């Protein structure tokens, strides 16, 4: 089995959502934060890929201290906010069938290792 293009597209979508979720938890501590990422991607009705990656969440400093909602200045809005994500390492990648049996597969390692995505807010 060769992993289809939709696998790589879905992986990019999952990585973007992962990076965006950091905004829900507040500011980041620096402009680069290393994290572990994992997800399951359905390839077809009977095959699922399980992915574990080491990623770097990229952030940029924002000084949007003016609260437009309340019309006041608030230092709570200063800080590093996610701006992108890049893949550092492939820790685990496996494909299983509907019986949870491992399935041999081929994939483009460079296509995963070279992922660098920018968030568009």
Question: Which residue ranges define each predicted feature?
Answer:
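Low-complexity, Ser/Thr/Pro-rich intrinsically disordered segments found in N-terminal tails, propeptides
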Residues: 1-46, 109-112
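Generic detector of leucine side chains in alpha-helical contexts
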Residues: 3, 11, 15, 28, ...
């Amino acid at each position: 089995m060769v992993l289809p293009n939709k696998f790589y597209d879905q992986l990019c979508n999952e990585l973007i959502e992962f990076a965006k979720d950091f905004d829900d938890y507040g500011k980041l501590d620096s402009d680069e934060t290393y994290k572990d990422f994992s997800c399951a991607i359905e390839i077809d009705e009977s095959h699922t890929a399980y992915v574990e990656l080491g990623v770097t969440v990229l952030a940029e400093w924002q000084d949007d201290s003016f609260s437009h909602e309340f019309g006041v200045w608030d230092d709570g809005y200063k800080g590093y906010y996610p701006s992108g994500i890049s893949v550092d390492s492939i820790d685990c990648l496996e494909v299983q069938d509907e019986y949870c049996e491992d399935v041999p597969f081929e994939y483009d390692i460079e296509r995963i290792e070279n992922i660098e995505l920018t968030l568009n807010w």
